[in-house]
């Protein structure tokens, strides 16, 4: 009997010790995912609830404020944004199939879950809040960024972006000026540097042809090519010739004064061609490259997203692969490289671009600014085409 009492007492003591350890010694695990909790607060924004023409744009005071979901994200208070041709196309449903796959790769959500959708890719503003893993930014920092098209856009009071997509704003620019550059700059940078392989160390003396030189991408491309000591030939209309010459273009060809092909025949062949126009230009433009010298034609006008919209994900990707593969092979046998390029969000690339801006080698080219209340008018302006720089929205 005494032995039984001793066993019971020992067991109770062990139970008490285990209970004390579980309560005191063990620390609860912490999920390092978000620094913000869901909010009930709202913000002003321009959104669309369906795809269509300009009348689908709707202003609301009740868009839910973004929150940080991942530890590498930051929330930016938008001071200025801009409208790009991609925004006009997305308003009409361009790329919806591929972009929705990126938003929801497991197809968990039902059709239309992307709405209300905020457009706008460029942002210049001030950091309001940082995720736990963000080391290079802090609240109060002035930053700029280009937001990928599958994310909620920048035509709102606040936007959340990944830390690797954002960069410190050039000190020499206002927010309005800075908002004109990120998307077009990164698109051109992708084509010239990442795909074309050109940089400040190998560009001196290279002959470069830019088709569609007076728009946002073209005006940036001229300046970065000249900053790297290339010889630039710009193709644009006569009324934009003064602009591109001021940006540094060595030769200017007016596409309205006659056949561009005929005018190019009087010039020496090129080492690099950047095509912002597309269409029939790619049938003749690569012929003006230097043969068997590593010369490259890069186009930013591709059927990638349209193929997916028209054929679906699988068939669209297959068609895209066949198209780019066959064209690259055909031009390879002609002694030139044929490539496609796309916008790539990158904070580190924006760091490099900011250095060029602050060094005075690149300046923003703004055609027109609009107040936040006039976003639909800005869309109509961009939709008309024939840009002479960028269209910027002052949000603050």
From Swiss-Prot:
- Gene Ontology process terms (BP): nervous system development; regulation of dendrite development; ubiquinone biosynthetic process
Instruction: Write out the residues that bind NADPH.
Output: 214, 216-217, 237, 255, 276, 300, 341, 343, 386-388
A Pfam family annotated for this chain is ADH_N
Localization per Swiss-Prot or TrEMBL: Mitochondrion matrix; Mitochondrion outer membrane
Q: How does it assemble?
A: Interacts with RTN4, UQCRC1 and UQCRC2.
Q: What is the effect of changing residue 321 to E?
A: In OPA10; uncertain significance
Main location per the UniProt record: mitochondrion
Pathway of action: Cofactor biosynthesis; ubiquinone biosynthesis
Q: What does the UniProt record report as the effect of altering residue 88 to G in this chain?
A: In OPA10; uncertain significance
Q: What InterPro entries does this protein's entry cite?
A: ADH-like_N, GroES-like_sf, NAD(P)-bd_dom_sf, PKS_ER, Quin_OxRdtase/zeta-crystal_CS, RTN4I1, YIM1/Zinc_Alcohol_DH_Fams
PROSITE patterns on file: QOR_ZETA_CRYSTAL (PS01162)
Disorder noted: Optic atrophy 10 with or without ataxia, impaired intellectual development, and seizures: An autosomal recessive disease characterized by progressive visual loss in association with optic atrophy. Atrophy of the optic disk indicates a deficiency in the number of nerve fibers which arise in the retina and converge to form the optic disk, optic nerve, optic chiasm and optic tracts. OPA10 patients may also manifest mild ataxia, mild intellectual disability and, rarely, generalized seizures.
The taxonomic lineage of its organism, from the top, reads:
Eukaryota, Metazoa, Chordata, Craniata, Vertebrata
Q: Name one GO molecular function term.
A: zinc ion binding
Q: What is this protein called?
A: NAD(P)H oxidoreductase RTN4IP1, mitochondrial
Presence of the UniProt keyword Plastid in the record: no
Q: What does this protein do?
A: NAD(P)H oxidoreductase involved in the ubiquinone biosynthetic pathway. Required for the O-methyltransferase activity of COQ3. Able to catalyze the oxidoreduction of 3-demethylubiquinone into 3-demethylubiquinol in vitro. However, it is unclear if 3-demethylubiquinone constitutes a substrate in vivo. May also play a role in the regulation of retinal ganglion cell (RGC) neurite outgrowth, and hence in the development of the inner retina and optic nerve. Appears to be a potent inhibitor of regeneration following spinal cord injury.
């Amino acid at each position: 009997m005494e032995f039984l009492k001793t066993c019971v007492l020992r067991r109770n003591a062990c139970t008490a010790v285990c209970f004390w350890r579980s309560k005191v010694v063990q620390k609860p695990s912490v999920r390092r995912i978000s620094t913000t909790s869901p909010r009930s607060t709202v913000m002003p924004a321009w959104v669309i609830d369906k795809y269509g023409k300009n009348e689908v744009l709707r202003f609301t005071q009740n868009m839910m404020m973004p929150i940080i979901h991942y530890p590498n994200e930051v929330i930016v208070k938008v001071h200025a944004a801009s409208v790009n041709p991609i925004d006009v196309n997305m308003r009409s449903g361009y790329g919806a199939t591929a972009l929705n796959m990126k938003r929801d790769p497991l197809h968990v959500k039902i059709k239309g879950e992307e709405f209300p959708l905020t457009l706008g890719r460029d942002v210049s503003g001030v950091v309001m809040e940082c995720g736990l893993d963000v080391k290079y930014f802090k609240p109060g920092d002035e930053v700029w960024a280009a937001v990928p098209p599958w994310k909620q856009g920048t035509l709102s009071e606040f936007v959340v972006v990944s830390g690797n997509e954002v960069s410190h704003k050039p000190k020499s620019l206002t927010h309005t000026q800075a908002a004109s550059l990120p998307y077009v700059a990164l698109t051109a940078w992708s084509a010239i540097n990442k795909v074309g392989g050109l940089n400040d160390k190998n560009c001196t003396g290279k002959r470069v042809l830019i088709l569609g030189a007076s728009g946002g991408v073209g005006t940036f491309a001229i300046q970065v090519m000249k900053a790297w000591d290339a010889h630039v030939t710009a193709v644009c209309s006569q009324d934009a010739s003064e602009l591109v010459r001021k940006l540094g273009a060595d030769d200017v060809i007016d596409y309205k004064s006659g056949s561009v092909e005929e005018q190019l025949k009087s010039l020496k062949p090129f080492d690099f061609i950047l095509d912002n126009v597309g269409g029939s230009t790619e049938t003749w433009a690569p012929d003006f490259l230097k043969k068997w010298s590593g010369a490259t034609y890069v186009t930013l006008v591709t059927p990638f997203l349209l193929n997916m919209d028209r054929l679906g994900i699988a068939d669209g990707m297959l068609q895209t692969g066949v198209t780019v593969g066959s064209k690259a092979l055909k031009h390879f046998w002609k002694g030139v490289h044929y490539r496609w390029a796309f916008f790539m969000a990158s904070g580190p690339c924006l760091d490099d671009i900011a250095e060029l801006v602050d060094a005075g080698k690149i300046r923003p080219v703004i055609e027109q600014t609009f107040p936040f209340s006039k976003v639909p008018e800005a869309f109509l302006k961009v939709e008309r085409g024939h840009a002479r720089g960028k269209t910027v929205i002052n949000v603050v």
